[in-house]
Swiss-Prot record:
The lineage of its organism: Viruses, Riboviria, Orthornavirae, Negarnaviricota, Haploviricotina. Residues 38-98 are annotated as: Disordered. The modification Phosphoserine is found at S272. The modification Phosphotyrosine is found at Y14. Belongs to the vesiculovirus protein P family. It is found in: Virion; Host cytoplasm. This is Phosphoprotein. Keywords: Chaperone, Host cytoplasm, Phosphoprotein, Viral RNA replication, Viral transcription, Virion. One of its GO terms (cellular component) is virion component. The gene is P. Essential component of the RNA polymerase transcription and replication complex. Binds the viral ribonucleocapsid and positions the L polymerase on the template. May act as a chaperone for newly synthesized free N protein, so-called N(0). Plays a role in virion assembly. It comes from Spring viremia of carp virus. Phosphorylated by host kinases. Phosphorylation play an important role in facilitating trimerization and possibly P-L complex formation.
Length: 309
């Protein structure tokens, strides 16, 4: 195609476009109500006497205007819309915004999730604590299924191993709600409790032996001072808890068929002992809270490396 033919086609297209624009302008102008060009003036008749003028003016109101003199496009519509105040609109918008309520919990649960994944909400209830993970509705479906599957596997292991009736509620995949009971459903068989009993028996036998002065440091919580420790926690030795916990493994069902199950230890999931202490309390259900409160970002990284999600 020569340059001349290209130029001619461009000019033809431009002419068609100009014609289309003019047609649209004509249609718009025809839709608008035309403004009357004639102007009507109100004049006084000189031959009108004062009595006649007073009688005419008495019938009508002083501020009344002849409706025939008002153009149609200036007449008021029957319906009047009143905008609400901006403050009321802001209050209505704030009521519909998603909020996460945080309260001081005697059990000291800290989920440890950042706002980038899910936002947890903790609330007390008779006999236990509810932990609700909001924000799962916007997560990728594969990740959401993985999180739900991971939580179910983890909660089943905790309940079977330590005798806690932990329930998981999954409402259409939008959020997960975990119920942590305050008391186990059967006798506590945790090794640290047994160690504590042996230590108490040993100390009762060695009462007569003199001891030197020992400095007793009572911890009031974690590094941020969030979790106040109760009397039961002060009596026990929290140092032995990490030694037991870091070797515990959490085994998850394989994400794909013909794949071995994924087994991770608490040491793999937590960075250090200090981070572990930030995610569990030394009062009653340390293992359960630590396992439920592991950071999903670290677990997801492990799963991603293994299954290439």
């Amino acid at each position: 195609m020569s340059l001349h033919s290209k130029l001619s086609e461009s000019l033809k297209a431009y002419a068609d476009l100009d014609k289309t624009v003019k047609e649209i302008e004509e249609q718009v102008s025809s839709m608008e109500e035309p403004v009357p060009k004639t102007v009507k003036y109100v004049t006084f008749e000189e031959n009108l006497s004062e009595e006649e003028w007073e009688s005419d003016s008495g019938d009508d109101d002083e501020d009344s205007i002849d409706d025939s003199l008002i153009p149609d496009y200036l007449r008021e519509s029957s319906s009047i819309t009143v905008d609400e105040d901006e403050e009321d609109q802001k209050e209505d918008m704030e009521e519909h915004l998603p909020t996460v309520s945080w309260e001081e919990e005697p059990t000291g649960i800290d989920i440890g999730f950042g706002p980038g994944i899910v936002m947890p909400s903790v609330s007390n209830h008779e006999g236990g604590t509810y932990v609700r993970y909001n924000g799962l509705g916007g997560v990728d479906p594969n990740c959401k299924d993985l999180i739900s599957k991971m939580m179910r596997s983890l909660i089943g292991q905790i309940g079977n191993k330590y005798g806690y009736d932990i329930d998981l509620f999954d409402y259409q995949g939008d959020f997960l709600e975990v119920f942590l009971p305050h008391k186990p459903s059967k006798e506590d068989v945790r090794p640290d409790i047994r160690i504590g009993k042996k230590n108490e028996e040993g100390t009762s036998k060695q009462v007569s032996k003199p001891r030197g002065k020992e400095k007793i440091v009572l911890k009031t919580g974690d590094e941020c001072g969030r979790f106040p420790m109760n009397k039961e926690a002060k009596k026990r030795e929290p140092e032995g808890l990490w030694e037991v916990m870091k070797v515990l493994s959490v085994q998850f069902d394989p994400w794909k068929e013909d794949e071995p199950p994924l087994s991770l230890t608490i040491r793999d999931l937590f960075i250090s002992e200090s981070e572990f202490r930030l995610h569990c309390n030394h009062s009653q259900t340390e293992r359960e809270m630590a396992l439920v409160g592991i950071k999903l970002r670290r677990l997801y990284n492990k799963l991603y490396q293994k299954y290439r999600l």
